[in-house]
Amino acid sequence: QKHSPTLNFENVLHHAQGDYIFLSDQDDVWKTNKVATCMKWLQKYDCVISNAEVTDEHLNILFPSLFKLLHVSKNKIYNALWKNGYTGCCMAFTRCVKDAALPFPKDIPMYDIWIGNVAAFLYKVKFIDDKLIYFRRHSLTISCNGKGSRYSLYKRLMFRVSIVKNIILLIHKIKGLTTH
């Protein structure tokens, strides 16, 4: 079976037992205050998305703000329909978000886009400007280089349709479970 970041993260989340989940990429470096800062916000919100400093492989700063580089919006409609604002390694969320997001729909573009939209449409999300990781980019990096999407306009539109469709299906599923 072909593996992808989405399938790998889905498998990991199925096994996650804690009340709080922090996503991480293997080559990013957490700052010492990441957990404490996110935990403070997770007392009021179900999902926290922090900013990051974008670095090269030697941790030299390339861009001081991931949010500015990617033009991150805090508006859930904008994030669902136009431009993704959710970067997995910058996310921490509660068990309820995890439980709602699983299992992942088969046609979602990427795990963090799905989790971020589930959190935004069903729970409370907080974007924080604190730069809590060094987001390392190098020649082997597959995702997020600030140079625009590698996908065609058609493919990006189909990703958005998939996210919106699956969020609507999830909302109907949850409402169906709570009305019976």
Task: Mark where each language-model region is.
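Short aromatic/hydrophobic "clamp" motif used to bind/position activated sugar donors
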Residues: I21
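Conserved nucleotide-sugar donor-binding catalytic segment
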Residues: H14, N75-G146
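Conserved donor NDP-sugar-binding/catalytic core segment of glycosyltransferases
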Residues: V35-L62
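Catalytic core of nucleotide-sugar-dependent glycosyltransferases
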Residues: V72-A80, F135-S139, C144-T178
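The conserved acidic donor/metal-binding loop of glycosyltransferases
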Residues: D25-V29, N51
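Glycine-rich, basic loop-to-helix element that forms the pyrophosphate-binding segment
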Residues: Q1-A16
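Acceptor/aglycone-binding surface of glycosyltransferases and processive sugar-polymer synthases
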Residues: T55-N84
